[in-house]
Amino acid sequence: MEIDNQTWVREFILLGLSSDWCTQISLFSLFLVTYLMTVLGNCLIVLLIRLDSRLHTPMYFFLTNLSLVDVSYATSVVPQLLAHFLAEHKAIPFQSCAAQLFFSLALGGIEFVLLAVMAYDRHVAVSDRLRYSAIMHGGLCARLAITSWVSGSINSLVQTAITFQLPMCTNKFIDHISCELLAVVRLACVDTSSNEAAIMVSSIVLLMTPFCLVLLSYIRIISTILKIQSREGRKKAFHTCASHLTVVALCYGTTIFTYIQPHSGPSVLQEKLISVFYAIVMPLLNPVIYSLRNKEVKGAWHKLLEKFSGLTSKLGT
């Protein structure tokens, strides 16, 4: 019975970013505004793509998936974080912690695979423009999107099951903003080298493999761009990929820094800041990046705003 009591913990205490009340209130206000802007921005991107027939292309189909992933990821972390800023007892039940870990891992994995798929899409658009529609047909796009969602979910299910089978003893204080993988593994009172090895393998399979595919796609894209004779043609081809390349650099960079070397990786504070960036900043940046650096999206925004202003003018008269 002693072992069973040590193995299962009913709830965890999240230590969060700060214990100072004024700091928590300030962070609550900042994160609430950021979260609402994230939900609004990504939902508007999805709505815009849905309403504008010019955006019914493979690139924007995958961007729709990416926006849904971003909103879901932020929602898996931020509401609980906001609630804990205002709560005196910052507890999270065992089942909720496991669910949060599963969804955050799954959605993160899905995003990595989606970014690799989007890189392939950009490669085809630049390198094989004439056959783009034939190659990136609806059936292939659907299969690639499903592969992204399934692979991320399966990896997360395995990692979550392995992690929550570890004996946690009496230690229930998670020094993090959420039930993050490395933070939960650190609670175990047994040797976790096998779990860290599993994290490493998982990171290589679901993080480095898509990353290598992204690199390969961009090597071929750059090779094609350099062969374009006109300066205007090279500029147009580069702008086709600029938004995606920016998101790839931000997304993969922070996660590789966190997970590829668990022993010699970032400090606990750095892990918290990286998680804040990934859960709060990145989902907000994605729609901004794709809107500001994409002429088609900006054109669709202007068209939608013109329709809206015309409608309000008619209603006003």
Swiss-Prot record:
Membrane topology: Multi-pass membrane protein
One Gene Ontology biological process: detection of chemical stimulus involved in sensory perception of smell
Gene3D superfamilies listed in its UniProt record: Rhodopsin 7-helix transmembrane proteins
Cytoplasmic side: 50-57, 121-139, 220-236, 293-317
Subcellular location: Cell membrane
A molecular-function term among this protein's GO annotations: olfactory receptor activity
Family the UniProt entry places it in: Belongs to the G-protein coupled receptor 1 family.
Protein name per UniProt: Olfactory receptor 2F2
Organism in which the protein naturally occurs: Homo sapiens (Human)
Gene that this polypeptide is encoded by: OR2F2
